[in-house]
Every structure is written in structure tokens, then in C-alpha cells.
Amino acid sequence: DIPAVSGLDGLRFTKPVTLFAGENGSGKSTLLEAMAVAAGFNPEGGTKNYSFSTRDSHSELCGAMRLIRGWQRPGWGYFLRAESFYNVATQEELYAREGRVPSAGLHERSHGESFLTVAQSHLRPQSLYFLDEPEAALSPQRQLTLLLDIHSCAAEGSQFFIVTHSPILLGFPGAEILSLDGGQL
């Protein structure tokens, strides 16, 4: 039950980058997760093809949500969450051994290095991305690197939905910022 979205009849996203901000517990991550799951992504993260599950704890909000897309369908996509990144990194390494993804050796790197590697290796034009608090793993310099990568990818037709507390990411030029504070959107 998220007060900020409980009375919503619809929400239209018109910009390539939408940032969700608000206090802890305001429902940002729950809303993002529901959007990602409604779009067909694994609740723990990854691509639409990732079917692993370590703990079934996602919100049922996705069942009450209907996504209506424009005429252009995303060719690729990724759901990247700071809180379940270890599980996604493990899955990425399994897929790397099979030659399906380029992200190998993630557990041998720092959290920030491996997180940025996964993010960068999956950024493609005309794709759909859900990022949940990416700043949790990244230094300010790496946040700027990610911001530039997102900017380039968005300029090539990709759409991003990002939950963040980071003033660096909240400073994204031209992004739509939605606050879930105070029980309203």
C-alpha cells in the first residue's frame, strides 16, 4: 500500500529519463519493481530472460498495474537493483561461462566496479531500463560516468526509470523528477 500511488488512475511518462525521489519507505522502489515486473522483468533484476529466484518477496502491485506502450517497442532492457545485485552478479557469471553475456569475474571486483560493468555492458539504444538506487554502489565519480552513459543511451531512444537519492543523478539534464513524499506523487 503506497499512499502516493493508491489514488492514481494513470501516469504518463513523456521524457526519456524519469527519476523517482522521496524519503525511505515512500514506495519508490516498490513502484519501480512493480513497473519492471509488469514489463516482464525478473523481480530480482536482470533481463526479461533471467528466471532465477532466491526469495519471492516482490510486491503484488504489478498485478494491479497495466503498462501501455507507444508504437516503438524496446529491443532490449534491464532491471538493475542495488539490493539484489549479488544475486544478479552470480547469474551474470553463470551466463558468462555459457558465453551469453560479457560480464565475467564480477565477484572478484569491488561492488562499484562490478555494478558499473553490468550497467555499461547492457546499455543499448532503443531499450528500456529500470535502475533502483544505482548510487548505492557507486562513488560520485562513477555516478557521473553512469550519468553520461545514460545520457548517451537516452539520446539514442532508450527510456530510463531510476529511483535515487543522489543529488548527482537528480541533476540529470531534462529528466522528469517525481517525488513520492507526503503520500502523493
What are these regions (language model features)?
Residues 141-159, 166-185:
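C-terminal lobe/lid and adjacent interdomain/linker elements of RecA-like ASCE P-loop ATPase modules
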Residues 1-9, 14:
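N-terminal pre-Walker A segment at the start of P-loop NTPase domains
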Residues 109-133, 141-153:
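GG-anchored amphipathic helix commonly corresponding to the ABC/SMC/Rad50 NBD signature/C-loop
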Residues 17-19, 29-97:
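ABC ATPase nucleotide-binding domain signature region
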